[in-house]
From Swiss-Prot:
GO terms for cellular component: cytoplasm. The lineage of its organism: Archaea, Methanobacteriati, Methanobacteriota, Methanomada group, Methanococci. InterPro entries: aa-tRNA-synt_IIb, aa-tRNA-synth_II/BPL/LPL, Ser-tRNA-ligase_2_arc, SerS_tRNA-bd. Keywords: Aminoacyl-tRNA synthetase, ATP-binding, Cytoplasm, Ligase, Metal-binding, Nucleotide-binding, Protein biosynthesis, Zinc. Pathway: Aminoacyl-tRNA biosynthesis; selenocysteinyl-tRNA(Sec) biosynthesis; L-seryl-tRNA(Sec) from L-serine and tRNA(Sec): step 1/1. ATP binds at residues 347-349, 358-359, 480. It comes from Methanocaldococcus jannaschii (strain ATCC 43067 / DSM 2661 / JAL-1 / JCM 10045 / NBRC 100440) (Methanococcus jannaschii). Zn(2+) binds at residues 318, 366, 473. This is Type-2 serine--tRNA ligase.
Length: 521
């Protein structure tokens, strides 16, 4: 499958550009390759974005950008914003007002037979047509709100899924209620007036600062206080009331555990793999010497000093729980209920990482339990019910829907071990995001899963009387609870819910540097 991208777009400035300002813009455009090639694998440079032409028109820079799969043309356009804003803001006090795409043609080449099956396909947000072995998607008049909603990549994913759809995902075969069905909801009693993107506001106020790693942030004292307040409430009002006991789970997970979980079958591209170093001090000395002389990191040399991948950074947080019980015999009349909140969870979102709600590094309170099927399903229901009660106590607007991507089934097409599955593998609780106007969208803050015998079989766990054993887990995404809370309450501490204010007492201040946070021009 080959993808090509051809974009006509524009960057809108706060005022018309002088000749000197145009020259400054052209300097950035001449160095665009270094901007576009960041993160592109070696040998794939020709598939990154390239500027085909550009012209100035008043306060607008019009651009034609083409690309292959890597740093897709719309990503290239977005990447230009920051260096242009920095250069023009610093030297000419000109800001970037917005980014727009006038016309965007994406061509997906595949086998002609596969393409033919998609004739007449309706793809949300764009026009789609099939010509021979090509599916052509055309987007028109795309603004920043659509780009933030990731509609382009979602449309491509939709088409690719349709092309590859030889059989349904296992989730859809197993689930007795159609994924996406809303099973409960709550409307806020107060009038919600805040309608800005919490990521934009948090960054502007200095509550967060971008970290160099993709999908990572530095969280400063004010937002950290909110993190801790919500975490404490979830532990006090939900987790401990149900009866979970706290443990400290490892976060560096051996690959063989992921294999036994079958996680490597479903989402192998969604993890950070860890390579231990070879214990060869002399070779590392060469690496250090070369780095000191060249003033850059010799990556190729470093690769040769690393062993094969042996671990992943925990992508689900519950992995150690199943390993704890491997080969053990339990009594389902004495179920085990643990929870962990001891560190970060890591998932590689790739190009999907955006804002504070979809990050590669995030905090969660993870509950995991084992017992009889009846106990496991009852406990899952409690983990949802108590979370709903907390949201209502805080007057947070939410809904609960049947999930379409339980982590242990995601991406998998079949199961050949005779596993017992629940009628509903996953429920997902979402907090409403009022700043997204085009559709009613929520951030998933709680994921409540029942696994049936999936992990019991994989880790050879038995009951001493031969009775059925199931497992379940619920993750409370603290990072996303924070995003949902700020999206509905805003950043004025006086407007926050009394329960949160009582927890925090006095909101810490943002550290003030000479150069940060940036002041409004």
């Amino acid at each position: 499958m080959k993808l090509t991208f051809d974009l006509d777009g524009k960057i809108i400035f706060s005022k018309e550009l002088s000749e000197e300002a145009k020259n400054a813009v052209e300097e950035v455009l001449k160095n665009a390759d270094s901007i576009f090639l960041k993160g592109v694998p070696k040998g794939k440079e020709n598939e990154a974005s390239k500027i085909k032409s550009y012209e100035f028109e008043g306060n607008i820079l019009k651009l034609k950008i083409a690309s292959g799969t890597y740093t897709r043309a719309h990503e290239g356009l977005i990447r230009l914003r920051k260096p242009l804003a920095e250069k023009l803001g610093r030297n000419f006090r000109i800001g970037v007002r917005g980014i727009e795409i006038d016309n965007y043609v994406i061509t997906i080449e595949t086998d002609e037979d596969k393409a033919k099956k998609l004739e007449g396909i309706k793809v949300p947000e764009c026009e789609a047509k099939v010509e021979g072995n090509k599916i052509i998607l055309t987007f028109k008049d795309i603004g920043e709100s659509e780009l933030k909603r990731n509609i382009i990549d979602r449309a491509i994913k939709f088409v690719k899924t349709e092309l590859e759809k030889e059989e349904e995902d296992l989730t859809f075969k197993v689930c007795k209620i159609p994924p996406g069905t809303i099973v409960s909801e709550y409307k806020a009693k107060r009038k919600i007036t805040f309608d800005k993107d919490p990521t934009d506001v948090a960054e502007k106020l200095g509550w967060v600062k971008k970290f160099p790693g993709r999908g990572q942030w530095f969280y400063t004292p004010p937002i950290t206080a909110l993190f801790r307040a919500l975490e404490e409430l979830i532990v006090e009002e939900v987790v401990k009331k149900i009866g979970f006991q706290e443990c400290l789970f490892p976060k560096l997970i051996p690959l063989e555990i992921m294999y036994k979980m079958r996680y490597l079958e479903g989402l192998p591209e969604g993890m950070y793999y860890v390579c231990p170093p070879k214990r060869e001090p002399e070779l590392f000395k060469e690496f250090v010497n070369e780095m000191m002389i060249k003033k850059e990191i010799p990556i190729e040399k470093l690769k040769n000093l690393l062993r094969d991948p042996g671990y992943v950074l925990a992508p689900a947080q519950c992995e150690p729980f199943y390993q704890f019980f491997e080969g053990e015999v339990i009594d389902v009349d004495k179920p085990i209920m643990f929870f962990d909140r001891s560190g970060w969870t890591y998932r590689w979102e790739g190009g999907g990482a955006r804002g504070l709600d979809r990050v590669n590094e995030f905090l969660r309170v993870e509950c995991v339990w084992i017992g009889s099927p009846e106990f496991v399903e009852e406990t899952r229901d409690k983990t949802l019910k108590y979370a709903e009660k907390l949201a209502e106590k805080l007057d947070l607007e939410y809904w609960v829907e049947v999930g379409d991507d339980p982590f242990y089934l995601e991406g998998r097409k079949k199961e050949d071990r005779g596993i017992e599955f629940p009628d509903v593998p996953k429920y997902e609780m979402r907090l409403w995001l009022p700043h997204i106007k085009d559709e009613r969208k929520g951030v998933a803050v709680t994921s409540a899963n029942v696994h049936g015998t999936h992990f019991v079989e994989g880790f050879r766990i038995k009951d001493y009387k031969g009775r059925r054993v199931w497992t379940g887990c619920t993750g409370y995404g603290i990072t996303r609870w924070v995003v949902g809370y700020l999206a509905q309450y805003g950043f004025n501490f006086d407007d926050w819910h009394p329960i949160i204010k009582k927890k925090i007492k006095k909101l810490p201040e943002v550290p003030q540097l000479i150069t940060w946070p940036k002041k409004d021009e």
